[in-house]
Amino acid sequence: MKRLISISLFLCLLLSVQAQKVYTTDNIPKVHLQNKMRYVCNPDGILSQAACDSIDRMLYALEQQTGIETVVAVVPSIGNDDCFDFAHRLLNEWGVGKKGKNNGLVILLVTDQRCIQFYTGYGLEGDLPDAICKRIQTRNMIPYLKDGNWDAGMVAGVRAVCGRLDGSMVNDTDDEEDISFFGILAAVIGFFVVAGGIGW
């Protein structure tokens, strides 16, 4: 009887692992290309519909006000692919950003890698440099994401990005002096940091 229970548990675990879909830039739904009012690709329902709607509204308003085009992709797995490379390919293959301005932004969350990645087009690097991306990730997103609160983390992160890009963020500065020594130390010790992306 115990052996049967063990086998059943093993099979359930195996099926659970197999059921987790691995996404590539070929099979991930091109949501924004199909509907310009939708900015969130959330094929496995990791985010709630309410969170997706909130993010869609913020990113639509941002694009109307600034012309900056942003897409958010939230997936359980990209296999052994690298978050930075994956986000880069999404930006290029989806054509995120206005033609001639290269002002697109991809925000990618991969839950099994515990990775949150920002990838900016060249035209946006001055407005959203790596230091600011990492600050938004560590201050606004990681505290929620590390607890598995995907909705709160992604909504807070997108809100901070919009505040930065539309000029509404209060007391914001490019100066890295406002990032304390202890904040930097915590980021180095507690997180794995890669060019606009962080694992927690």
Regions found by a protein language model. Give the residues of each.
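Bacterial Sec-dependent N-terminal signal peptides
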Residues: M1-T24, I184-V188
